[in-house]
Amino acid sequence: MSSKKRKDAEVAQARVEITPDLDVEELEGVGRVTGAKLKERGFFTVRDVAFASVKELAEIVGNEERAQQIVEAARKMLGLHSFVSALEVYERRKKIRRISTGVRALDELLGGGIETRAVTEVAGEFGSGKTQLCHQLAVMVQLPEERGGLGAKAIYIDTENTFRPERIMQIAKARGLDPDQALNNIFYARAYSSDHQMILVDQAKSIIRQHNVALLIVDSVIAHFRSEFPGRENLAERQQKLNKHVADLLRLADAYDVAVVITNQVMAQPDVFFGNPLRPAGGNILAHGATYRLWLRKSKENIRIAKIFDSPYHPEGEVSFRITEEGLVD
């Protein structure tokens, strides 16, 4: 890359990195009244608008033409309105941050840990260790970078009432953190329905803007959707709603440089006679929505097996780890 092109790329990237907190009213064509309407619906910053869909904004500002102009202005301000070279994408990916799982073998399987700007799905049966991993990640993100963390806070959305602060304290103590402070660094909310779950994700944006948050956990992403939309007759409506939820999570991860971890339940395939009859719930929506997909399963005693079964660049592979009083360990 020539020095001029490299400088242009650096300027564009710098613009992306320094603009996220610009108030939405800084945008051309957005005055106080429109700004108030956008903020009421969760669009506080230029970056919020840049990652929104035109249809989404049209419902707020009144028509698609004006919404298109506002979205384009936001993307232009962030340098997101044009193509870039693959080399520039590669340079940006070098700046991706990772959170250690606390299990060396699992980190190696994931290429260094859980990535920011991505959605990582963790699927498995009841008792396979999904929630245990979520608890551990909520602690690990708080560690300094030299110890595998990001020196940051976490947001934990609990849909099945499985979050246990006592477990956080155990893991924190084992990792040399003050247990009370570790709990104080986790923003927790219980989601009571799929609508509430989606509202909480919108509210999470405000917390991320105001605090040093680098991890958002949704445990589990599918539970309310399955219980509220039973039967084939409701499947299309469920998947449409789930699709919006997953898209919101992907946008949030990319817009705010946070790691999003979602857990997923499993379902049986009655027509499978050989191999594993179980598959992750959520169908193609979750299959295409998650950036990385992990499958956890039980082995003997307290041993669990983690397999990466879908990734843009990781090869398939599996590793084992143990669940102990101190957390997940090799």
Curated annotation (Swiss-Prot):
Gene Ontology biological process terms, A to Z? DNA recombination; DNA repair
Q: Which InterPro entries match?
A: AAA+_ATPase, DNA_recomb/repair_Rad51_C, DNA_recomb/repair_RadA, DNA_recomb/repair_RecA-like, DNA_repair_Rad51/TF_NusA_a-hlx, P-loop_NTPase, RecA_ATP-bd, RecA_monomer-monomer_interface
GO molecular function term, any single one: ATP hydrolysis activity
Q: Which domain of life is it from?
A: Archaea
This protein's UniProt keywords: ATP-binding, DNA damage, DNA recombination, DNA-binding, Nucleotide-binding
Cross-referenced Pfam families: HHH_5 (PF14520), Rad51 (PF08423)
Give residues annotated as binding ATP: G124, E125, F126, G127, S128, G129, K130, T131
The record's section on SUPFAM superfamilies has: P-loop containing nucleoside triphosphate hydrolases, Rad51 N-terminal domain-like
NCBIfam families named among the record's database cross-references: PRK04301.1, recomb_radA
Main function: Involved in DNA repair and in homologous recombination. Binds and assemble on single-stranded DNA to form a nucleoprotein filament. Hydrolyzes ATP in a ssDNA-dependent manner and promotes DNA strand exchange between homologous DNA molecules.
Q: Which family does it belong to?
A: Belongs to the eukaryotic RecA-like protein family.
In Swiss-Prot or TrEMBL terms, this protein is called DNA repair and recombination protein RadA
**Source species of the chain:** Pyrobaculum islandicum (strain DSM 4184 / JCM 9189 / GEO3)
